[in-house]
Curated annotation (Swiss-Prot):
Binds 1 Mg(2+) ion per subunit. Ca(2+) may be able to substitute. GO terms for molecular function: ATP binding; lipid kinase activity; magnesium ion binding. It is found in: Cytoplasm. PANTHER family: LIPID KINASE YEGS, SPHINGOSINE KINASE. Its EC number is 2.7.1.-. The keyword Transferase applies. Its cofactor is Mg(2+); Ca(2+). Keywords: ATP-binding, Cytoplasm, Kinase, Lipid biosynthesis, Lipid metabolism, Magnesium, Metal-binding, Nucleotide-binding, Phospholipid biosynthesis, Phospholipid metabolism, Transferase. The lineage of its organism: Bacteria, Pseudomonadati, Pseudomonadota, Gammaproteobacteria, Enterobacterales. It comes from the Bacteria. This is Probable lipid kinase YegS.
Length: 299
């Protein structure tokens, strides 16, 4: 095998007992690849490991986990100063893996690992909220976000996507649309939003295509707002994301401002952020990511 620069794998602590992953790493090491492995235990670990990766001089930092792990590692990478910043590699090990799935990362661990180490590094965008928090995939808001956040893990494990509908029915008396005003380039909307999706990537919630036209290197955010008066039909339609839904409002802009008279919550790659005012902007070509040559999210 051709020689490749060293890589550092930042592995989510929940995946440490993954025997196939251990075997894949050992096999690549036997073939001559240098792969350092670090395991996260708490928030902040990923940033420290990225700093260590720079001191080691690795060419790639691999995020081994779900969307949250990819978010942490990519955020740490774009905060690096200077030259020779490592590229991002992706090893999907989470329960949803929305970003990895949408960009075409192989499901097979050995293939995904080889791509993460030896794939072509492409400059991609990220998004930033209120000049602080970042997301690489999507920000989602509305009652759908509250349902997916609050649905018990045991119910999700037992029933999958149906669990969200059941939990939504149980919460019917407390679910209300979010009244808000959203502005962007050549875009202005005000009303009651059942679900809001602002995407650098296309899907969230374990496969829901909320922003099907999004690209990760076009310098734009895609916006989709689901409106409607009846909660139950809206809940079902948002899970199905019907293209013919008359209650879908779309927009595209390099930034969006969102204001609400009450506190609303956005889910940023799995992490909640609450407030009344949000400024969301694209960060063009913020980092390099190793992607397959046929990645559908590249223009």
């Amino acid at each position: 095998m051709a020689e490749f620069p060293a890589s550092l794998l930042i592995l989510n602590g929940k995946s440490t007992d993954n025997l196939p992953l251990r075997e894949a790493i050992m096999l690549l090491r036997e073939e001559g690849m240098t792969i350092h492995v670090r395991v996260t235990w708490e928030k902040g670990d990923a940033a420290r490991y990225v700093e260590e990766a720079r001191k080691l001089g690795v060419a790639t930092v691999i995020a081994g986990g779900g969307d949250g792990t990819i978010n942490e590692v990519s955020t740490a990478l774009i905060q690096c100063a200077g030259d020779d910043i490592p590229a991002l590699g992706i090893l999907p090990l989470g329960t949803a893996n929305d970003f990895a799935t949408s960009v075409g990362i192989p499901e097979a661990l050995d293939k995904a690992l080889k791509l993460a180490i030896a794939g072509n590094a492409i400059a991609i965008d990220m998004a930033q909220v209120n000049k602080q928090t970042c997301f690489i995939n999507m920000a989602t808001g509305g009652f759908g976000t509250r349902i997916t956040t609050e649905t018990p893990e045991k119910l999700k494990a037992a029933l999958g996507g149906v669990s969200y509908i059941i939990h939504g029915l149980m919460r019917m008396d407390t679910l209300q649309p979010d009244r808000c005003e959203i502005r962007g380039e050549n875009f202005h909307w005000q009303g009651d939003a059942l679900v809001i999706g602002i995407g650098n990537g296309r899907q969230a919630g374990g496969g829901q295509q909320l922003c099907p036209n999004a690209l990760i290197n076009d310098g734009l955010l895609q916006l989709r707002i689901f409106t409607g008066d009846e909660i139950l039909p809206a809940l079902v339609s948002t899970l199905k994301s019907d293209e013919d839904n008359p209650n879908i409002i779309e927009g595209a802009s390099s930034w969006f401002d969102i204001q609400a008279p009450h506190e609303i919550t956005f889910n940023l790659d799995g992490e909640p952020l609450s407030g009344q005012n949000f400024h969301i902007e694209i960060l063009p070509a913020a980092l390099r990511c190793r992607l397959p040559p046929d990645c559908p999210l590249l223009r």
